[in-house]
């Protein structure tokens, strides 16, 4: 899929912009504060139903305006069909209002399922060395887009977990807790299996990509932590054993909501010793592997939005990353404050835009 038109009204520094990106590589150059990141933020907002920079009250609506509007047209192409799609989001101070293909939508998840965007922004490097919730969210994004029933499964587990935690806080009778334990274990085992299988698929992509971009790290696997000792006992037994502790804590201390995954390297003891640049490269390769898996399952590529791609990367690694991106038929939106040396060989296969004072101008 690729965006053919992006319309912004009263969004951040943009008053009124109609922009037409090209398929393939799109470079956006401009000074700090010119609106480059805001442009990618708008695309991200359409694909995730939320901003990666804050809430509406944090300045999404242009100063002096009462509302914002974002519209996007894109071409959707799988192995069989091609069709044009259109979506819009507006906010008038109370709530988001979304439309998809001319129809009002009740839930933003409907829009998110239609437009697949993979974003790398300033905090994305935390995927590798921060809390496990980000890594679970990474797996769940991929499953949400390639397995139609995954959202229902995830919602079911979240609901049952909430009910069990409520019972633990209220010190409810044992019979009620056992019933919820049974349901939690049934759904939790399914959720865990989906995540594990998905990570196994990604592993086949991630290891060659990381080996190519930074061979000195000698990656040899992605380790999955189920959230309990699954190799020793099923979830229902683990919940029974932890029941007294859970009563004491007032919450469920193990299960898929405690799962995690980490890259394993032969040359270093763990991800905690990676430099910021290395962490950025590893994260980028994980995202690219996810995009490739999306193509394998859906027959089309998601949109890649990469903010400040060249920062913290030397010229050699800039070149390697761009080489990989140029090899795939995905639409890629890349921002930077200047034209990095590593990008220059790829201008012939992409388009360059200048962003300044809320305006976007094509350079070549």
Curated annotation (Swiss-Prot):
GO cellular component: cytoplasm
Primary localization class, coarse: cytoplasm
UniProt-listed GO biological process terms: DNA replication; DNA synthesis involved in DNA repair; double-strand break repair; SOS response
Entry keyword set: ATP-binding, Cytoplasm, DNA damage, DNA repair, DNA replication, DNA-binding, Nucleotide-binding, SOS response
Residues engaged in binding ATP: 30-37
Molecular functions (GO terms): ATP binding; single-stranded DNA binding
The family this protein is said to belong to: Belongs to the RecF family.
Name of the protein described by the UniProt record: DNA replication and repair protein RecF
Lineage: Bacteria, Pseudomonadati, Pseudomonadota, Gammaproteobacteria, Lysobacterales
């Amino acid at each position: 899929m690729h965006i053919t038109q992006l319309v912004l009204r009263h969004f951040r520094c943009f008053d009124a912009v109609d922009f037409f990106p090209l398929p393939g590589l799109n470079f956006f150059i401009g000074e700090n504060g010119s609106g480059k990141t805001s442009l990618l933020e708008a695309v991200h907002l359409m694909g995730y139903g939320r901003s990666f920079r804050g809430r509406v009250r944090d300045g999404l609506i242009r100063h002096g305006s009462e509302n914002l509007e974002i519209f996007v047209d894109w071409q959707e192409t799988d192995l069989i069909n091609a069709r044009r799609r259109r979506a819009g989001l507006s906010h008038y101070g109370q709530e988001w209002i979304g439309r998809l293909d001319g129809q009002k939508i009740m839930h933003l998840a409907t829009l998110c399922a239609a437009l697949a965007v993979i974003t790398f922004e300033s905090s994305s490097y935390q995927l590798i060395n921060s809390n496990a919730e980000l890594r679970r969210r990474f797996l769940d994004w991929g499953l949400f887009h390639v397995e139609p029933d995954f959202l229902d499964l995830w919602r079911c587990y979240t609901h049952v977990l909430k009910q069990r935690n409520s019972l633990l806080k209220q010190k409810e009778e044992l019979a009620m807790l056992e019933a919820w334990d049974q349901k939690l274990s049934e759904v939790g085992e399914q959720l865990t299996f989906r995540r594990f299988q998905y990570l196994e698929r990604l592993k086949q992509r991630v290891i060659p990509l990381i080996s190519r971009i930074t061979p000195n790290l000698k990656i040899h696997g992605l380790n999955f932590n189920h959230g309990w000792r699954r190799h020793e006992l099923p979830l229902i037994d683990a919940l029974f054993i932890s029941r007294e502790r859970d009563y004491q804590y007032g919450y469920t201390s193990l299960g898929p909501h405690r799962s995690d995954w980490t890259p394993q390297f032969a040359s270093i003891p763990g991800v905690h010793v990676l430099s910021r640049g290395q962490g950025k490269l590893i994260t980028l390769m994980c995202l690219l592997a996810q995009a490739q898996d999306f193509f394998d399952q859906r027959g089309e590529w998601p949109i890649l939005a990469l903010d400040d791609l060249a920062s913290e990367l030397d010229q050699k690694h800039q070149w390697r990353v761009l080489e990989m991106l140029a090899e795939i038929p995905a639409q890629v939106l890349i921002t930077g404050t200047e034209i990095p040396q590593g990008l220059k060989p790829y201008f012939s296969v992409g388009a360059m835009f200048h962003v300044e004072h809320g305006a976007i101008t094509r350079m070549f």
